């Protein structure tokens, strides 16, 4: 008589257990030992019971474990321009790199970018709350109340650390495309690209914009983390003209220079720049290393706006039709 079938050998189904997310599943990808399920609103990590208990010693384990990773789904620009864009571009059919490793690093980079945005939002909320409180309070004597956004040094340090972690992951991805970059920095990448492709190459033009900010991130982090001179962070401060200045940061260290700037603006601008940089480097590095595909004239191009919501990305492999419209393939 045949042995009874183990419960884990049977088919089944499950629903995402998040009452705050009733949106449909839009994407699924297998990465490492996990399945990632992405709805319009959130991203989840799923693993099977055999991954938790491979020897099947506990028959009472539920067949599936699910965990919400982010409140970032296919409606999120952060996720679309990082993880979704990497999924479309970092493909074995088109590239000779370690695509699985590139995807793992992209996910790790997204974790840092999501945390960085939380720091941005937290600081912006603290700053605005302090401003609102000041505007709502009337002066009772001849003194002037100066608001506070909290420990601005700590906020800036946390932001710089998360930003630098993201930049480090991005450099690891770069080294999958350019093995000779191992142990080298952004200046080295820029010099290599100019020597190989020429100053006017679009990839070099992207690096001309990106590298100064990537170095600013590292230098700001070094100063704040190691208490080095070169970064000045100020909370709300009274000015000689009687006004109250908002929290600011200025940088002058190792060639990186930033004039006194509102901290909330600095954070939002750097966060946007990092997202732009990831997307553009992914596009240009993939284009530079694209392999021939079945004898067809494939290239990377902009996904038409009317189908971007279906693709969840702005760039893809494809071809131009006779009318000059880019047709994404894959």
List PLM regions with ranges.
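Acidic, contiguous internal or C-terminal segments within carbohydrate-active enzymes
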Residues: 127-136, 146-158
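Generic structural signal for bulky hydrophobic/aromatic residues embedded
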Residues: 119, 162, 169, 224-227
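Extended, well-ordered alpha-helical segments in internal regulatory regions
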Residues: 160-178
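Acidic, Ser/Thr/Gly/Pro-rich intrinsically disordered interaction regions
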Residues: 1-114, 140-154, 172-330
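Extended alpha-helical scaffold segments
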Residues: 113-134, 160
């Amino acid at each position: 008589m045949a042995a009874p079938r183990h419960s884990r050998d049977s088919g089944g189904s499950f629903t995402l257990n998040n009452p705050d997310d009733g949106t449909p599943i839009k994407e699924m990808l297998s990465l490492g030992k996990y399945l990632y399920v992405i709805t319009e609103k959130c991203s989840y990590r799923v693993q099977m019971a055999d991954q938790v208990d491979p020897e099947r010693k506990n028959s009472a384990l539920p067949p599936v474990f699910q965990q919400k990773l982010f409140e970032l789904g296919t409606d999120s620009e952060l996720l679309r321009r990082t993880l979704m864009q990497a999924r479309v571009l970092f493909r074995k059919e088109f590239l000779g790199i370690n695509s699985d490793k590139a995807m793992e690093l992209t996910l790790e980079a997204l974790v840092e970018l999501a945390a960085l945005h939380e720091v941005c939002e937290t600081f912006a909320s603290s700053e605005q709350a302090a401003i609102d409180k000041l505007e709502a309070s009337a002066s009772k004597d001849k003194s002037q109340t100066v608001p506070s956004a909290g420990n601005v040094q700590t906020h800036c340090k946390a932001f710089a650390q998360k930003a630098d972690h993201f930049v480090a992951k991005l450099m690891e991805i770069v080294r999958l495309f350019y093995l000779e970059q191992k142990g080298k920095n952004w200046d080295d990448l820029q010099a290599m690209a100019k020597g190989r492709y020429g100053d006017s190459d679009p990839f070099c033009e992207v690096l001309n914009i990106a590298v100064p900010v990537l170095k600013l991130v590292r230098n700001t982090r070094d100063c704040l983390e190691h208490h080095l001179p070169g970064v000045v962070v100020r909370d709300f401060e009274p000015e000689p003209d009687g006004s109250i200045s908002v929290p600011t940061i200025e940088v002058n260290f190792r060639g990186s220079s930033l004039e006194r700037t509102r901290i909330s603006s600095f954070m939002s601008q750097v966060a946007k720049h990092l997202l732009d940089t990831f997307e553009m480097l992914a596009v240009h590095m993939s284009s530079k290393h694209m392999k021939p595909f079945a004898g067809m004239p494939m290239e990377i191009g902009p996904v038409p706006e009317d189908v971007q919501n279906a693709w969840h990305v702005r760039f893809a492999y494809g071809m131009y039709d006779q009318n000059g419209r880019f047709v994404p393939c894959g």
